[in-house]
């Protein structure tokens, strides 16, 4: 049974709206590390400026894309529910707190050119912080789904359920994937810099047949 009273209706709508607002703010703040780029007259071209800050720029676009996919997954999961109980609330709050912290981890990771494209070099732990945050976001989504499946009264009665290896292990695979990149970054930033490429291919393996949504990460 669900833990505590199930809050539905307007209370549930407000939780979803609150979550969407925090994601919108966090994903906008991601651009701040590169918002102040400028060209000193006679000193550099626009391409040189972009090249000098390629780490921050690549990190911004990748993180923007990943957060968008994570929000899409979160939105799909929450839309399948009719309300929330205590565990759902706190897991969602944890999810939001890490989303809100991502601009910090993204800025630290982007400052190091070692993070992307086989650049090599020392990440100083910023890779572990960045990818560990991604893993925690996926973990919270996975735990929300796991709790809801154990408490079917949280679901809308007309929602279809899928019981395949993809639905059981997809979330854990993403958690392991993100965490693995972080661990590898501690020892070999060059190897870990190619890890993000997997994010574009994992959905081809892990999405349910017939699913039209790309990059589900629950």
Describe the role of every protein-language-model region.
Residues 1-218:
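Multi-pass alpha-helical transmembrane bundle typical of ion/small-solute transporters
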């Amino acid at each position: 049974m669900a833990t505590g009273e199930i809050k539905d209706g307007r209370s549930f709508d407000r939780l979803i709206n609150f979550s969407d607002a925090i994601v919108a703010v966090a994903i906008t703040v991601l651009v701040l590390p590169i918002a102040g780029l400028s060209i000193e007259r006679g000193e550099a071209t626009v391409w040189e400026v972009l090249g000098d800050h390629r780490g921050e720029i690549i990190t911004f676009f990748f993180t923007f894309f990943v957060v968008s996919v994570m929000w899409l997954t979160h939105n799909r999961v929450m839309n399948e529910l009719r309300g929330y109980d205590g565990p759902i609330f706190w897991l969602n709050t944890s999810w939001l707190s890490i989303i809100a912290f991502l601009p910090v981890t993204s800025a630290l990771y982007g400052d190091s050119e070692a993070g992307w494209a086989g650049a090599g070099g020392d990440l100083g732990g910023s890779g572990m912080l960045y990818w560990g945050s991604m893993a925690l976001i996926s973990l919270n989504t996975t735990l929300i789904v796991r709790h809801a499946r154990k408490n079917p009264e949280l679901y809308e009665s007309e929602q279809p359920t899928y019981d395949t290896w993809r639905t059981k292990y997809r979330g854990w695979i993403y958690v392991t994937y993100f965490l693995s990149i972080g661990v590898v970054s501690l020892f070999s930033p060059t190897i870990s810099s190619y890890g993000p490429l997997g994010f574009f291919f994992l959905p081809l393996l892990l999405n349910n047949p017939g699913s039209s949504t790309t990059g589900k990460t629950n």
